[in-house]
Amino acid sequence: MDSASHITVSVVIPTRNRPSLVTRAVASALAQTYAAVEVCVVVDGPDDVTISALQQITDGRLQIVRLPQNVGGASARNVGVRNARGRWVAFLDDDDEWLPKKLEKQMMMAVESPYEYPILSSSIIARTPHGEFLWPRKFPSAPLSEYLLARSSWTQGEGVMQTSTLLTKRELLLRVPFQDGLRKHQDWDWLLRSVALPGTGIEFVQEPLAIWNVEEKRATVSTTSDWRYSLEWIRQSRLFVTRRAYSGFVATQLGSQAAEQGSWNAFVPLLKEIICEGEPKPIDFCLYFGMWLLPGRTRRWVRSWANRNQLAVAKQRMTGPTMA
């Protein structure tokens, strides 16, 4: 750890109108066992309440950047990267938290990486209204687009590289910034474009280092945007995804969105998209039809039932058996 402990890591946290959540996120970043940390909170638009809450934190490692108008999460992250003083940048969403050794463990791996531009991620504890789950169930593999976008089972959490787990060099983020104005799929978009750059590779810490607070009832861009927006994004990303990944994304992401919105006129066109533009596997058809035929509440119950013991089993695997 000595070779990495002096290297400054800048933590970029975009936020808007969530003072109680962002102060919790900041506290988890400032509580890292890795000492060489600065925290850059980008307040995305006029927000006096959040500014006031952040100003109560007296730690000199906290930097507050105020934006005069709302620009969205992708652009706010880019502002944070440009203001960062560290050689490395880690991202943290304002409603998530880090475990204390997150940066320490990732930086230990980062300095040993053979890649010029390593992108580090980790397992994550997904905290949902239905319980806690340890994701991902599979660790990253090539091609990355299939790992992220295609599924091989009924349950969620197979391929996950959540934004709050990401750490990489600031230089890479300046060369490949987040796509300004992109409302959805920001992390997938950045990851897929970044790994296309020579010298870039994925490094993964297999233990959970962050908590992803998943609130299914909270309205977000991801839950309110029309499915057509996601279709346009995947079409524009064809150079970065395999045909298998394309089919998987349309089947699960677009199928779920269109079904939730009751857009039955999209059923046949999306099915044609899966078949004609991709290379689907049987699981893609099963998932697609399931999205339309099973109500959202039923699908969530099935996922919860299938995964309910996962976190306990994983914790036992990491800590060893309990002695009677």
Which role fits each region the language model picked out?
Residues 89:
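Short aromatic/hydrophobic "clamp" motif used to bind/position activated sugar donors
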Residues 75, 103-172, 223:
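Flexible acidic/His/Gly-enriched loops in nucleotide-sugar-dependent glycosyltransferase catalytic domains
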Residues 141-227:
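Conserved nucleotide-sugar donor-binding catalytic segment
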Residues 23, 47-56, 97, 101:
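Acidic helix N-cap motif at the loop->helix transition within catalytic regions
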Residues 28, 35, 43-52, 69, ...:
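A conserved acidic beta->alpha catalytic loop
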